[in-house]
Amino acid sequence: MPYQIAVTNNSPRFKIVLPFLSISLGLIIALCGDSFKSDSVSYLDMGDYFFQGDWRAILNGLWSPLFAIVHGLSRWLFKPTMRWEPTLVQLTNFFVFVSTVLAFQFFWSEVFRLYRLLSQREPQPSSSCFSENEFWGFGYAIFLFMHLNLVTCTTPDMLLSTIVYSSAGLILKIKLSGATSLRFWLLGLLLGVGFLTKAVMLPLATVFLMAAVLSNLRQRLLLFYLLAALVAFAGVVSPYVYELSREKGHFTTGEAAKLNYAWHENGAPFTHWQGEIAHLGKAEHPTRKLFSSPLIYEFARPVRGTYPPWYDPSYWNGGLRVQFELGNQLRALVKHLNTYLRDLWSQNVLIACCLVLVALRQDIRPILHDFLSVWYLWLPAVAAFALYGLVWVEYRYIAQFFVLFWAAVLTLVRLPAHNHSRRTIRAITIVAVFLLTIQIGTNLVRECIDGHRAASLQMDIAEGLAAQGVRPGERVTLIDADLGAGWQKLARLVVVAEIPFEERETFWSLDIAKRNEIYQVLAKTGGSVLIAPEVPHWAPTTSWQRVGSTPVYIYRLHP
């Protein structure tokens, strides 16, 4: 039987204003943001190839397909020029953020229903609680604090937030309103889409399904409902896994976990692994080393992309094996624990205000009991923290899971009834929202300024290269390739060889005769120019041309 809950709707307009305010702030930050961060270029390449008719382009061992398809669709529909491409990328990111806001709205409405239910079941029904306005205001302040600075990040993390909030909200819906085959089927469907968004959702899907099942053990048809969820999940995941396995020549659900563990825990290089670490395996098809001092690597074929070594690292790292080493793992856990503590410290306002609100209940036993009773709300977050903690942690990976954790904490706020309880809750809520708003505003201004500066530089480089005759589709070579350099994508370049960052000073220290030898080697790769994103102030730049007023220089390999 579903629970019967009396929810007080004392300000329906407030719940409408909050998402519109969030969407407006998201639009502001999107329009002045940096379009190309981290792994963005690889996702954009995948989407472009997919909508050019190569559907197998999304069968990538590292990057999941859904985010690439979303961006590929917008670029295929609008076909932006170079000048408008960053704007289109950011508008696409913005619409992903809108989906996250809507998913959070659904999730938070279910959290509020749960909070009201728990409050009504208190042995002292007159206990003081959040009003509806306070609960929603606090919730959106947390949401914006966690997510607003990620709007411009062209990675699938915001899209995954949409899936996480929708799935968590649906679990609460099942808990509060009763299980049905349709709700479990939708949950399985969402989790399958989550896997197509980021591979980490494959193990996390187990946790979400476990939360849905174990929180509804009294349901008579529970096994049937679970089967409906599993069928939906398999229906989404299986075709992709089948085709990916065919593409890679062996069964695989993706290589993200293996590659990240090898990079972060085993010390394998992110690019140009040559099998130099013997216990990690033998390189099956590494990038080709053309020169030893400085090191030069060529990768014109068979993988395409703006920067092929990062378009599909699973190909170039074929033969790589991960090794579990207890010492390395313990060091990684300590390092990642420090990362979590640093992220928590940035949330000191939340910690302080929630700690005061919960501590005012005075008795620790009911607090622990109540927190454990909403395990289905915080368990997926703890599981995500544990999974990332084993391998690698970045804030953008875990922002949505912090929100789930704080949602569970806010359900504990039920103070003993006395004259000052309501005023205490209201005062602390106002202080928390006010301080979080200041931090949100500060982050918004910083993101707008830094994002606009970075986006302008990328555009200046791309347009400067075009002005100097470097055409779209042209093959180029690089000194110190930047994995997140959007100017390469904007200029439609194809990087075929590079001198890595750590070899930069070696190259610039060479005499003219030796450098001419390097130029001849690079020319044989098919690259028309050598591009140096930065040149040391002491380095000779004879025969090099500066790209406008940017720090980039080019050298023509084929005069």
List where the protein language model places each region.
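Membrane-embedded, lumen/periplasm-facing catalytic core of multi-pass transferases
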Residues: 247, 259, 424-485
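Extracytoplasmic catalytic/substrate-binding loops of multi-pass membrane glycan-assembly enzymes
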Residues: 32-46, 57-74, 83-87, 248-255, ...
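Membrane-interface transmembrane helices that cradle and orient dolichyl/undecaprenyl
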Residues: 7, 126-131, 167-183, 194, ...
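Short acidic/glycine- and proline-prone juxtamembrane loop motifs at membrane-interface regions
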Residues: 38, 63, 149-160
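Lumenal/periplasmic acceptor-binding loop at the mouth of the active site in multi-pass
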Residues: 266-367, 374, 498-502
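Specific aromatic-rich, kink-prone transmembrane helix
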Residues: 139, 144-146, 159-177, 183-191, ...
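Transmembrane-helix motifs of polytopic, lipid-linked glycan transferases
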Residues: 91-126, 166
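Short periplasmic/luminal acceptor-recognition loop of GT-C membrane glycosyltransferases, typified by
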Residues: 282-283, 287-293, 455-456, 466-504, ...
